């Protein structure tokens, strides 16, 4: 793989269930150090796409770090590709630090003092320093989501070479301040060379934080470009069936989307 090759490349990815096409000939890529936001209404194919990128629904049409996904052993992929699902329910009263330490499993069979230090540092990055011995089941939904975000940070920590982080609606259960804190941290990871793909519902968060947006409608790509190019009233109408006004944010160098009705 060359330095300019994508961390993820999707080529002619299609997927159907019971004769219904959920994804149709998708084609896009994710570069190292880039944040790509995946947008679209419910049922557009966002979660189905994410399950293909993880190999859950099949591995054809997807390359990871320049290799076909089907040729990469799961244990090797786990060292360099981390996934934050929208929901990660836990049934047992794990301590918070132990949950974060799950992210270190791909890197060795035995837990080390260094692993615990890494996990604690990752908790600090998500604003949960001091929560190490808390029962994860006593935390709010948003706090639990941040614990799992710390787990993905621990999973990618110290890895040499390309890394990818897949986020499925990472801001869904968070308040306003933590939505922005989470996406600012995602941007920090991009500056560290991580390729970040995030499924988002909030168009303005995507406009503010993403380098590019991939907009889906009924399993088709209708736009894949910089937010200022892709987020137009026409593309948003096609994707969401709703009229919007798109203007320039008064403080930030990005589009601002407001409802027209």
From Swiss-Prot:
Localization of this protein: Cell membrane
Recorded GO CC terms: plasma membrane
Membrane-related topology note: Peripheral membrane protein
UniProt KW keywords: ATP-binding, Cell membrane, Membrane, Nucleotide-binding, Plasmid, Translocase, Transport
GO MF entries: ATP binding; ATP hydrolysis activity
InterPro entries reported for this sequence: AAA+_ATPase, ABC_transporter-like_ATP-bd, P-loop_NTPase
Entry EC no(s): 7.6.2.-
Enzyme type, top EC level: translocase
Binding site for ATP: 40-47
Domain ABC transporter span(s) in chain numbering: 8-243
CDD domains with a match to the protein in the record: ABC_Iron-Siderophores_B12_Hemin
Subunit relationships: The complex is composed of two ATP-binding proteins (HmuV), two transmembrane proteins (HmuU) and a solute-binding protein (HmuT).
Functional description taken from the UniProt entry: Part of the ABC transporter complex HmuTUV involved in hemin import. Responsible for energy coupling to the transport system.
Protein family membership: Belongs to the ABC transporter superfamily. Heme (hemin) importer (TC 3.A.1.14.5) family.
Name of the protein this chain belongs to: Hemin import ATP-binding protein HmuV
